[in-house]
């Protein structure tokens, strides 16, 4: 083995069928242990993307802090499970706010997409007590960028999320008809991405 392509590993699809269901967390942990073992055994090989980097990338607060520290503009952000704090932040944002998962989705590889909160959802915000989440001021956009860094090479694509109904908030929601095109980003942005 000379190189490892490690991109979005998934648990076996039939794991959700495992009976009794109490065994699922155990088996899930065994797969995580396998991936960690491979990361150690193959540490001297080329990884795309390195296992431990992917683990760090799952930590959204860490990502936000890094982005802010290297000079990217980061939306106003609140991480909490306190509904009163969410209500205060909602007012601060003028009712223009999104909610995101704090981490990756462990539930059968399902994704909970970024959602723009409405007055109706804010009336039910007490449910946030069950689990912390990331709340951010909504920023309108013309399109979204997906940037991939491999070594010192930076590849960017523009995702035309605003022209595809259902994708205006989160391009991943219904990505079948999305137009994606190469995009030239400024050198200063490239440098920050490599940093």
Where are these regions (language model features)?
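Conserved N-proximal alpha/beta basic substrate-recognition cap immediately N-terminal to
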Residues: 1-73
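Short acidic/polar capping segments at secondary-structure boundaries
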Residues: 11-12, 52-56, 79-85, 103-105, ...
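General beta-strand structural signal in soluble alpha/beta enzymes
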Residues: 47-49, 76-80, 99, 135
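Rossmann-like NAD(P)H-binding beta-loop-alpha module
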Residues: 70-94
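Phosphate-binding site of ATP-dependent enzymes
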Residues: 85, 91-185
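ATP-dependent carboxylate activation and anion-phosphoryl transfer catalytic cores
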Residues: 184-195
């Amino acid at each position: 083995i000379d190189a490892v392509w490690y991109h979005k590993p998934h648990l076996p699809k039939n794991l959700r069928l495992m009976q009794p269901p109490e065994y699922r967390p155990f088996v899930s942990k065994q797969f995580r242990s396998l991936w960690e073992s491979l990361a150690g055994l193959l540490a001297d090989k080329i990884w795309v993307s390195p296992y431990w980097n992917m683990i760090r990338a799952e930590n959204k607060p860490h990502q936000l802090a890094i982005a802010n520290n290297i000079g990217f503009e980061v939306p106003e952000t609140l991480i909490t499970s306190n509904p009163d704090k969410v209500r205060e932040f909602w007012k601060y944002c003028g009712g223009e706010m999104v909610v995101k998962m704090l981490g990756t989705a462990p539930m059968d590889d399902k994704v909970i997409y970024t959602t723009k909160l409405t007055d109706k959802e804010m009336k039910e915000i007490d449910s946030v007590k069950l689990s912390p989440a990331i709340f951010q001021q909504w920023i309108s956009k013309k399109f979204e960028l997906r940037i991939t860094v491999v070594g010192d090479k930076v590849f960017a694509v523009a995702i035309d999320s605003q022209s595809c109904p259902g994708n205006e908030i989160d391009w991943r929601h219904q990505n079948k008809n999305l137009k994606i095109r190469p995009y030239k980003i400024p050198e200063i942005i490239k440098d920050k991405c490599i940093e």
